[in-house]
Amino acid sequence: VGLVDGVIEVFKPIAQSKSISLELNSEIEFVNVIIDIEMIKSVVRNLISNAIKFSHKDTVVMVHVKVQDITNENATGEGNGKEVLVTVSDKGCGIKKEDQGKLLNEATHFTTFGTNSEEGSGLGLLLCKDFVSKNHGRLWFTSEEGVGSNFNFTIPIK
């Protein structure tokens, strides 16, 4: 969790400059996870950066971290039956329903624009998905246009 704290502290001034609050809600204090720390930092940085980019002024970007049991739905065959779940939620512009299937698909490429006309290509998310997969985790999202998005990833606890 200290890893997530550090990334949040780096992004707080950026969020504040856009009148966005960046907050952490953690249900854990310490988890011993054998992972590529720089990879995890990259994933968290990308998800927070995107959330800030696509959030409206005077909203909150929330980072939630917890440990959960691995269920059949999200089983990877790795770890001890537990995984860390990180969720980055925003109340931004959301993703159009017709674009949601394209976002994590390597075969498609499209350009999006944030709330301040900042450009996004989705390539960072593809890299995040690849990084997480290589660590036996998953990355997925839910989104509603005009409401916001939740980007989630898991890493098994070893």
Where are these regions (language model features)?
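Short alpha-helical Gxxx[C/S/T] motif in the catalytic ATP-binding
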Residues: 119, 124, 128
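Glycine-rich ATP-binding loops of the HATPase_c
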Residues: 136-142
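Short conserved segment of the HATPase_c
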Residues: 95-109
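Short helix-loop "hinge" at the ATP-lid/N-box region of the Bergerat-fold HATPase_c
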Residues: 51-52
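Glycine-rich ATP-lid/hinge loop adjacent to the conserved G-boxes
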Residues: 108-119
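Glycine-rich G1-box
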Residues: 13, 93-94
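Conserved catalytic submotifs in the C-terminal HATPase_c
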Residues: 16, 21-31, 68
